Amino acid sequence: MSNSENTGRIPLWLVLTIIGLAAIALLALFFYGSYSGLGSSL
């Protein structure tokens, strides 16, 4: 058990969760922007 590996570092599952949420948020923003923009123009 080497504690020096995890000291001062963010856990991998937390990083993956944040990256996943950010990717979903970006996709949602792109879809919402294209939908509202194209929908209102049409």
UniProtKB/Swiss-Prot annotation:
GO terms for cellular component: chloroplast thylakoid membrane; photosystem II reaction center. One of its GO terms (biological process) is photosynthesis. The chain crosses the membrane at residues 10-30. It is found in: Plastid, Chloroplast thylakoid membrane. Its main location: plastid. InterPro entries: PSII_PsbJ, PSII_PsbJ_sf. Keywords: Chloroplast, Membrane, Photosynthesis, Photosystem II, Plastid, Reaction center, Thylakoid, Transmembrane, Transmembrane helix. It comes from the Eukaryota. It holds the Pfam family PsbJ. It is a single-pass membrane protein. This protein is a component of the reaction center of photosystem II. PSII is composed of 1 copy each of membrane proteins PsbA, PsbB, PsbC, PsbD, PsbE, PsbF, PsbH, PsbI, PsbJ, PsbK, PsbL, PsbM, PsbT, PsbY, PsbZ, Psb30/Ycf12, at least 3 peripheral proteins of the oxygen-evolving complex and a large number of cofactors. It forms dimeric complexes. Belongs to the PsbJ family. This is Photosystem II reaction center protein J. It comes from Euglena gracilis.
